[in-house]
Amino acid sequence: MRIEQLREHLRALGARPGHEQSVLRHWACALPQQRRSAREDVLPLALREALPALEAELQGLARLRSEHSAEDGSARLLVALADGQTVESVLLPRDGLCVSTQVGCAVGCVFCMTGQGGLLRQLGSAEIVAQVALARGHRAVKKVVFMGMGEPAHNLDNVLEAIELLGTAGGIGHKNLVFSTVGDERVFERLPQGAVKPALALSLHTTKPELRAQLLPRAPRIAPEDLVAHGERYARATGYPVQYQWTLIDGVNDGDDELDGIVRLLAGRYAVMNLIPYNTVDGLAFQRPAWERAVAMAGALHRRGVLTKLRRSAGQDVEGGCGQLRARALGGARWIKIEPVSGTGAHHVDQF
């Protein structure tokens, strides 16, 4: 379901714009539709009579199948959709929520569990917001990051529609809505045009174009320099820095040569580098580097003029890597290995 379809249904029941916003606010904020102030209790009769069935339908868009709490205060939610498919959401410490935008993913990042199964279907904008409503039934949600299963750029209309609602009726500050992408020209065209302009996170992972093409095999072929240039323009236009995501993988992208590349790209930019040690996935032949190495990299980048945050992967003890919980429920995994090609400085990907 798309939010626009929901709006059309409300209008057919006699809702005026204020009525629409009231119903959508109650839904997105997980407030019972039947509990309204006297001022709000002026909905048209047909709409009031339809509310119980409507509320049940909206709740059915995303239902909790299982919850797995972690020691760091995060909790991974396996969410069942109305058609029986499942996606993952993650309740993050400090009132954050990570939501999914697709069932599966077409980018095929070789270190990501979600990417191994390909794309099954898009989520409708209402299904995306429904994850927020479901989470708000558990705890407060003041920040939403679109970093769960799926590539938001590949479901752009639905994601932007969800962002518009969350940034208005949903009561979430625009900079606390974080659109995460591997990079796509359509994103850089569309985001500046929206009434709600989210913060932007770009999945960089390496400064080497050839290695990035292997790690993210079906991502658009945008050179790291061009990706950063796009990000810088958006950051200056919105007034909040771009977050660059870097999944630290032992022996793959944690070398001193990558440090030099990051400094070349990001020193002096309106940017934050997020170093995220790899969240180990059963069946994938990647490992996180030693914590001491991650700390050393963050410190070196700070000293060389790149604002850097070293993040512990949320939910490491509850299968916190993207797609792990769903894969565990479905069963199956595929081994992937990246090895240096002797004498070339490049890397070779083996899948078996």
From Swiss-Prot:
Annotated organism of origin: Methylibium petroleiphilum (strain ATCC BAA-1232 / LMG 22953 / PM1)
GO terms assigned for molecular function: 4 iron, 4 sulfur cluster binding; metal ion binding; RNA methyltransferase activity
Stretches assigned to the Radical SAM core domain: 91-317
S-S bridge residues: 98-322
Lineage, top ranks: Bacteria, Pseudomonadati, Pseudomonadota, Betaproteobacteria, Burkholderiales
Active site: 88, 322
Chief site of localization: cytoplasm
Keywords noted in UniProt: 4Fe-4S, Cytoplasm, Disulfide bond, Iron, Iron-sulfur, Metal-binding, Methyltransferase, S-adenosyl-L-methionine, Transferase
GO annotation, cellular component aspect: cytoplasm
Family according to the record: Belongs to the radical SAM superfamily. RlmN family.
Details of cofactor binding: Binds 1 [4Fe-4S] cluster. The cluster is coordinated with 3 cysteines and an exchangeable S-adenosyl-L-methionine.
Its EC number(s): 2.1.1.-
Binding site for [4Fe-4S] cluster: 105, 109, 112
UniProt-listed Pfam families: Radical_SAM (PF04055)
One of the protein's GO biological processes: tRNA methylation
Amino-acid positions noted as binding S-adenosyl-L-methionine in the UniProt annotation, renumbered to this chain: 150-151, 180, 203-205, 279
Name the UniProt record assigns to this protein: Probable RNA methyltransferase Mpe_A3613
